């Protein structure tokens, strides 16, 4: 499907149009099937970066559980469990700006484990990559790499000072250079303006990811954004999702962390009109819904599980 290549003004006008009309427009790009994926937090905490939303940053006293890289048997067990829940894609996620050199060979062995489970597609989220790392991941058969932009370029300095928006985009380009699929999304509700949400949609359209994970901020105590409970409401979440889908018709919009900030009714509405994927189970440092509830919701909507 050819991208519409709408201008910022056109997307903003869509954002501010009647909600029913907006959702009707976005629904034209939605398939009748929903993808399920899942993750394992394979290394937790002690991250050197100062992302203001993140429980895993060593800059904040968030009291989360920290641990080194999981071994192969633990990852394989988690992937097989995710498969029983209906996931067809599974990702290893590690904390930190990028993979530590001494850990990278272990990470590659985890990719091999992911690829060994029949019927599952491998994914990894390891932070910022250099050329050699991206090449090695591709050589080991990694199907998809996840790396969010998190917000738009103009707002990025407000959420992080230890790396740049451009560093993130560079990693996205490396992923595509070496033939891997790209999963690249955002976190909504971090204080961005409506105009900046439009910028996110347009910047993602330039990157052209295969999947766009949509996270909604779940404020973590002891982080700088701990009081950001009211930066986006349910209607504006729906409006943002619709505009993202219209601007990125070929990408699968995916519900990820924080979607419980939407009512069950609005989660269903989003799945009808703009969202085609769900991360099932728990997230990195927050709790998700029971997979059985998500399966039931999708079936009630008359959609197939991919």
Describe the role of every protein-language-model region.
Residues 18, 51, 147:
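Residue-level signature of catalytic and energy-coupling elements of molecular machines
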Residues 34-41, 61-64, 91-104, 155-156, ...:
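Glycine-rich, proline-tolerant flexible connector loops at the mouths of alpha/beta enzymes
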Residues 34-41, 90, 122-124, 145-147, ...:
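Hydrophobic faces of well-ordered beta-strands that scaffold small-molecule active sites
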Residues 1-23, 77, 83, 205-306:
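Auxiliary Fe-S-binding modules of radical SAM enzymes
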Residues 60-185, 189-199, 203-207:
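Conserved Radical SAM active-site core
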Residues 39-42, 96-97, 126, 188-190, ...:
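Conserved short loop/turn motifs at secondary-structure junctions
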